[in-house]
Amino acid sequence: MAARLCCQLDPARDVLCLRPVGAESCGRPLSWSPGALPPPSPPSVPADDRAHLSLRGLPACAFSSAGPCALRFTSARRMETTVNAPQSLPTPLHKRTLGLSPRSTTWIEEYIKDCVFKDWEESGEELRLKVFVLGGCRHKLVCSPAPCNFFTSA
């Protein structure tokens, strides 16, 4: 089962924070105040790191003892482009594998992975739904502005 994480922008520190979503949510809306501790969940990161994960472009699995996974990324706007007009997508200028060898990724995966880091590093969090998924990665993220409403199923 994929780990579920809620991603919130903390404007006070200008960072993205990932918080584990408890298995009891089962796709129902979930919200908590930005300073609250996350509900308990099976640790994918060391226990002392789970209470406060402040990230700039790093997936949750960056803290895993197994090393980071790669994440595929798209926003609602890019999903339309990716699904409906794949021939219009540019070749990525550079690829970020984060644990995957170049031979194990397709050009579309490289393009999508590159999008998330550009958005996080250059423009910050958009106020729209973002979905992060990659086959083989045990992390699945749903991002929305605070309060975090987790409404999809893994």
Swiss-Prot record:
Residues 68-117 are annotated as: Mitochondrial targeting sequence. Belongs to the orthohepadnavirus protein X family. GO terms for cellular component: host cell mitochondrion; host cell nucleus. Keywords: Activation of host NF-kappa-B by virus, Activator, Apoptosis, Host cytoplasm, Host G2/M cell cycle arrest by virus, Host mitochondrion, Host nucleus, Host-virus interaction, Modulation of host cell cycle by virus, Transcription, Transcription regulation. This is Protein X. HAMAP family: HBV_X. The gene is X. Multifunctional protein that plays a role in silencing host antiviral defenses and promoting viral transcription. Does not seem to be essential for HBV infection. May be directly involved in development of cirrhosis and liver cancer (hepatocellular carcinoma). Most of cytosolic activities involve modulation of cytosolic calcium. The effect on apoptosis is controversial depending on the cell types in which the studies have been conducted. May induce apoptosis by localizing in mitochondria and causing loss of mitochondrial membrane potential. InterPro entries: Transactivation_prot_X. The keyword Metal-binding does not apply. A fraction may be phosphorylated in insect cells and HepG2 cells, a human hepatoblastoma cell line. Phosphorylated in vitro by host protein kinase C or mitogen-activated protein kinase. N-acetylated in insect cells. GO terms for biological process: DNA-templated transcription; symbiont-mediated activation of host NF-kappaB cascade; symbiont-mediated arrest of host cell cycle during G2/M transition; viral genome replication. May form homodimer. May interact with host CEBPA, CFLAR, CREB1, DDB1, E4F1, HBXIP, HSPD1/HSP60, NFKBIA, POLR2E and SMAD4. Interacts with host SMC5-SMC6 complex and induces its degradation. Interacts with host TRPC4AP; leading to prevent ubiquitination of TRPC4AP. Interacts with host PLSCR1; this interaction promotes ubiquitination and degradation of HBx and impairs HBx-mediated cell proliferation. It is found in: Host cytoplasm; Host nucleus; Host mitochondrion.
